[in-house]
């Protein structure tokens, strides 16, 4: 069996890994094996971070809505329950933006729903 020289393909693969890892520190950007491992770790961390980001933003929106609606005497859970009951399709992101930019509008929404 003849020997296969993997010159171009191997160089292309390593160059792609080096390009990805060029911003890493120390040997993680220079050595192929450690750069490959760090690339895998970076991709795993970014995947995990995207899921965590969704959770964190949802928590932030809920906190903002709750802070504004409690000033009006309505807890967050009751507001969301009444929104669902009246079939108003306002998600938490939009409600949080309304709570920050225009509190009176959110007060009007909550007063209309609760009645």
Swiss-Prot record:
Transmembrane segments: none annotated. It is found in: Plastid, Chloroplast. GO terms for molecular function: rRNA binding; structural constituent of ribosome. GO terms for biological process: ribosomal large subunit assembly; translation. GO terms for cellular component: chloroplast; ribonucleoprotein complex; ribosome. Keywords: Chloroplast, Plastid, Ribonucleoprotein, Ribosomal protein, RNA-binding, rRNA-binding. Its main location: plastid. Gene3D superfamilies: 6.10.160.10, Ribosomal protein L20 (1.10.1900.20). PROSITE patterns: RIBOSOMAL_L20. The keyword Ligase does not apply. CDD domains: Ribosomal_L20. Belongs to the bacterial ribosomal protein bL20 family. PANTHER family: 39S RIBOSOMAL PROTEIN L20 (PTHR10986). Binds directly to 23S ribosomal RNA and is necessary for the in vitro assembly process of the 50S ribosomal subunit. It is not involved in the protein synthesizing functions of that subunit. This is Large ribosomal subunit protein bL20c.
